[in-house]
């Protein structure tokens, strides 16, 4: 119990250090900070140039957050892969408590009970407008073409499912305290490749990815990623691959990241115009630098780390776009921006040898591992009106603790 209390105090060091509890926790909702959570996907601690003096990446905008805010040097995600980490962030609980575990890729059933408190419902009750934009990967209830048949067919061919994309998709963010949602069901290498806005698939005209993209390129080398096993999938080069499967006809793999960032910015601008006195919380869940490493053409070829490094630059640019929008709307002073990653980078020893870059800052393990490199993540928080000087917190904490921290503020 004593150890738990010590950990609890460490979790709230930001609140205690930055401002008097008696003056802030009693504020009216109109004076509470806006909150933007930017969650990178598979970005290692060592990918942030401000955290790794040997980094071959360049992240000037994330580095600026370090220079202006709180840098947690011993932060950990709730898991070493996507779903457990996101479950912990959204619910404030560790993933082993979830009744249901992994299912099939983007067709995962909802993992979070509708009656459970989440960061969305918590902040809703505190008077916030809440939004979830980007990668979800916590399960959804899909409508079926034939209710008496399983959604995923038996056998090896799981490309064509029993999913009716014209029907409402429930059990997601809107059922869990988010007023607005614009999501990708799972990772950008997992079908179905569709955008869902407030429970409706944007484009229900479904094709297969292999109908729109060549499985290989003329330049593709016959040396596949170690985890790549299915010759039916799309594979262009190291890190640029995704599973074949159902996809909206209008969906563009190479434009997904930009669409998510644009939707997040649009939510902020629309909210401030519509309800300037109401605080908002945006959970902006990016798809990069998770595979496929498909950076915008503006960034292609600009990094010494190949496609992966190009994608890191685009992630950093997304941070810049968010902060620029907050400044343009004159709300940056009272907006808390949280930047983190859902787990360590998937960066094998071969990659380290080829690029001379340690995504996970030399720590043992990588994404998917129980070792430190699998879950030791960057965590940086800025809040200009309250955090006047940058400082570093060396105490151990977890992204799971963010929900409790927000609860303490409301």
Spans of model-derived segments:
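Positively charged n-region of N-terminal signal peptides that target proteins for export
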Residues: 1-5, 27
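Terminal low-complexity, poorly structured segments
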Residues: 5-10, 35
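Bacterial N-terminal signal peptides
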Residues: 8-21
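Formylglycine-dependent sulfatase
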Residues: 23-410
């Amino acid at each position: 119990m004593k150890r738990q209390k010590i950990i609890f105090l460490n979790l709230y060091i930001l609140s205690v250090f930055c401002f008097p509890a008696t003056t802030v926790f009693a504020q009216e909702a109109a004076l509470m900070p806006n909150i933007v959570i930017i969650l990178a996907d598979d970005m290692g601690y060592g990918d942030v140039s401000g955290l790794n003096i040997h980094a071959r990446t360049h992240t000037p905008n994330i580095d600026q957050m370090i220079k202006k805010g709180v840098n947690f040097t011993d932060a950990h995600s709730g898991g070493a892969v996507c779903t457990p980490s996101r479950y912990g962030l959204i619910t404030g609980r560790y993933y082993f408590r979830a009744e249901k575990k992994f299912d099939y890729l983007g067709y995962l059933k909802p993992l979070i009970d509708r009656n459970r408190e989440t960061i969305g419902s918590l902040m809703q009750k505190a008077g916030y407008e809440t939004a979830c934009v980007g990668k979800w990967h916590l399960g959804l209830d899909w409508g079926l073409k034939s209710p008496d048949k399983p959604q995923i067919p038996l056998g090896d061919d799981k490309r064509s499912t029993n999913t009716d994309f014209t029907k409402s998709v429930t059990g997601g963010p809107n059922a869990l305290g988010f007023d607005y949602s614009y999501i990708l069901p799972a990772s950008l290498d997992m079908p179905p490749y569709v955008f869902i806005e407030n429970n409706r698939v944007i484009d229900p005209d479904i094709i297969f990815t292999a109908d729109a993209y060549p499985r290989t390129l003329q330049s593709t080398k016959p040396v596949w990623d170690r985890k790549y096993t299915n010759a039916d999938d799309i594979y262009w080069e190291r890190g640029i691959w995704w599973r074949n499967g159902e996809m909206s006809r209008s969906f563009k793999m190479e434009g997904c990241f930009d669409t998510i960032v644009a939707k997040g910015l649009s939510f902020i601008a629309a909210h401030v115009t519509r309800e300037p006195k109401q605080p908002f919380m945006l959970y902006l869940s990016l798809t990069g630098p998770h595979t496929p490493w498909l950076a915008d053409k503006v960034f292609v070829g600009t990094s010494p780390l190949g496609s992966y490094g190009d994608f890191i630059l685009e992630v950093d640019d997304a941070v810049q776009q968010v902060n620029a929008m907050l400044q343009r709307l004159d709300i940056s002073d009272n907006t808390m921006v949280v930047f983190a990653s859902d787990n360590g980078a998937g960066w094998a020893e071969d990659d380290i040898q080829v690029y001379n870059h340690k995504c996970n800052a030399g720590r043992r393990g990588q994404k998917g591992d129980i070792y430190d490199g699998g879950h030791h993540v960057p965590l940086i928080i800025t809040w200009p009106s309250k955090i006047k000087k940058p400082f570093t917190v060396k105490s151990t904490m977890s992204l799971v603790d963010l929900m409790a921290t927000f609860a303490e503020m409301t």
